[in-house]
């Protein structure tokens, strides 16, 4: 598989992480590079590790995994999205402070946005792709796009203030529904 093809695949796989990064950037009262790097590196790491997992383990259980992977992503994104909407309606501001962004929360988002990368890893095994090169390209692409996503979300959040967390929650739920539809209709 050519490097060009790998970069295109990486860009496509990064779109969920980018959208969630925009959603989280919307909730930031003040832009913070520490938070931005934390989320970008988390998403990049998950996007790089999931193809490795898919390549080495997932290919043995591909029928089993494909039956429920989309439900996991859907549930994680919806739970987090509903919580964000609840926070926006009750005027709680737990997501405004980057230090409140827990490892558990980041892990849930990282898993939810990288389920497709797990499936791609299974495909890479069948195509005999160099998995280390593919994982590196996917991780780097996701990290860069997530950095831009948080920054873009914060920029937009500065302009719409009050509805930012509500919009962020809606984006996460929409991403969950998208994952479910893709796997149920096109899977």
Swiss-Prot record:
Keywords: Cell inner membrane, Cell membrane, Ion transport, Manganese, Membrane, Transmembrane, Transmembrane helix, Transport
Membrane topology: Multi-pass membrane protein
Family annotation (Pfam families): Mntp (PF02659)
Compartments where found: Cell inner membrane
Domain of life: Bacteria
InterPro entries from the UniProt entry: Mntp/YtaF, Put_MntP
Name of this protein: Putative manganese efflux pump MntP
């Amino acid at each position: 598989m050519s490097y060009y093809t790998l970069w295109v695949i990486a860009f496509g796989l990064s779109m969920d992480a980018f959208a969630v990064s925009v959603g989280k950037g919307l909730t930031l009262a003040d832009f913070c590079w520490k938070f931005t790097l934390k989320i970008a590196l988390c998403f990049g790491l998950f996007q790089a590790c999931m193809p490795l997992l898919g390549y080495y383990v997932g290919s043995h259980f591909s029928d089993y995994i494909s039956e429920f992977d989309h439900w996991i992503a859907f549930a994680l994104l919806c739970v987090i999205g509903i919580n964000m909407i609840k926070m926006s309606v009750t005027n709680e501001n737990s997501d405004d402070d980057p230090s409140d962004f827990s490892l558990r929360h980041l892990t849930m988002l990282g898993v939810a946005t990288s389920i497709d990368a797990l499936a791609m890893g299974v495909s890479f095994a069948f195509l005999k792709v160099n998995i280390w090169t593919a994982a590196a390209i996917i991780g780097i692409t996701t990290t860069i796009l997530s950095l831009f996503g948080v920054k873009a979300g914060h920029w937009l959040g500065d302009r719409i203030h009050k509805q930012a967390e509500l919009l962020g929650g809606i984006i996460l739920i929409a991403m969950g529904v998208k994952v479910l539809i893709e796997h149920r209709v096109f899977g």
